[in-house]
Amino acid sequence: EEREHMQEAIRILSEITGERPLGWYTGRTGPNTRRLVREEGGFLYDSDTYDDDLPYWDSESTPEKPHLVIPYTLDTNDMRFTQVQGFNSGDDFFTYLKDAFDVLYAEGCEGAPKMLSIGMHCRLLGRPARLASLARFIEYVKGHEKVWCARRVDIARHWHATHPFTAERN
């Protein structure tokens, strides 16, 4: 049943956008989700994990069928506007993103690669005051050198090109 739902989602997204999706995120995975994503093929990555800060090759990857994982986040995520201990205002969201960025930027300047993933949903962050906090954050980030703001598909393409799968890396 999960495979059928996945195939239907791919069909619908392809029909609506004119392109097949290149990444996958379920959000509520089952024991077979990643295997089904690999078997379905055609994906550059999936984001159904919260276990790391950087992309990595799935442990089931093979040279013939490498599978990239780009972790998602619940930490720097606008879903926290819906939680009791989450964000109460756009200022909370901005400050949290800024603090996360500042720590990662400093670590990156010391030579450690970093990635800040921000979970955004139009029904949450698309509210005027919340959107203003995102605009402020983007302006803040643009004031720093050597920062790349990218979509997940761009990160996946970069990772495939720059850090290709090898059995030794896995």
Where are the regions that the model predicts?
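Generic, low-specificity signal for short hydrophobic/alpha-helical stretches with a mild N-terminal bias
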Residues: 6, 19, 79, 86, ...
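Generic detection of long, well-ordered alpha-helical segments
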Residues: 3, 87-94, 127-131
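Glycine-rich phosphate-binding loop at the start of an alpha helix
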Residues: 3, 31, 116
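C-terminal domain-boundary segment and adjacent tail
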Residues: 45, 98-170
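Glycine-rich phosphate-binding "P-loop"
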Residues: 1-7
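Active-site-adjacent pocket scaffolds in enzyme catalytic domains
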Residues: 11-15, 19-111, 166-168
